[in-house]
């Protein structure tokens, strides 16, 4: 799993962000993958939708939000891995069974679901 260490909270997470005007959810996911990691998604699969208390997040500036997360899995991509320097400290591949401890709290449930899915396959 390719993760990014963010510059704002210094925690690991996946590429993501807000939907811009006129974009679909999938277009936004593809754009964020390219902007933050330099990769172009060839195929994406809707994996998980997450909302509620477990998506509560407090930004380093004190802003509090509840996110709605629509998670895609991208297994086929092309391009050269390149981090977005303003938002990303580091990009690194991890084995899904060896995810770092310092991942952002709101994405922990997503990884739990991903691990469950892999065990069913």
Name these PLM-found stretches.
Residues 50-80:
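Active-site-adjacent beta-strand/loop module that shapes the phosphate/pyrophosphate-binding cleft
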Residues 10, 35, 79:
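Glycine-centered loop/turn positions within well-structured domains
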Residues 71-73, 82-113:
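NUDIX/MutT-family hydrolases
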Residues 116-121:
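Acidic/histidine-enriched, glycine/proline-rich intrinsically disordered or flexible terminal extensions
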Residues 12-16, 92-95:
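A short, polar/proline- and glycine-enriched secondary-structure boundary/capping micro-motif
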Residues 1-14, 41:
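N-terminal strand-loop-strand
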Residues 7-9, 25, 87:
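Residue-level structural signal for beta-strand termini and adjacent loop
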Residues 14-48, 72:
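The catalytic Nudix box helix
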């Amino acid at each position: 799993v390719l993760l990014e260490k963010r510059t704002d909270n210094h925690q690991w997470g996946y590429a993501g962000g807000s939907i811009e005007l006129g974009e679909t959810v999938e277009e936004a996911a593809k754009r964020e993958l390219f902007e933050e990691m330099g990769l172009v998604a060839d195929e994406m699969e809707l994996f998980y939708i997450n909302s509620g208390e477990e998506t509560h997040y407090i930004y380093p500036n004190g802003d509090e939000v509840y996110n709605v997360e629509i998670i895609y899995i991208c297994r086929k991509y092309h391009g050269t891995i390149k981090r977005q320097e303003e938002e990303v400290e580091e990009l690194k591949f991890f084995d899904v069974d060896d995810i770092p401890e310092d991942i952002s709290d709101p994405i922990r449930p997503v990884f739990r679901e991903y691990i469950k899915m892999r065990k069913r396959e």
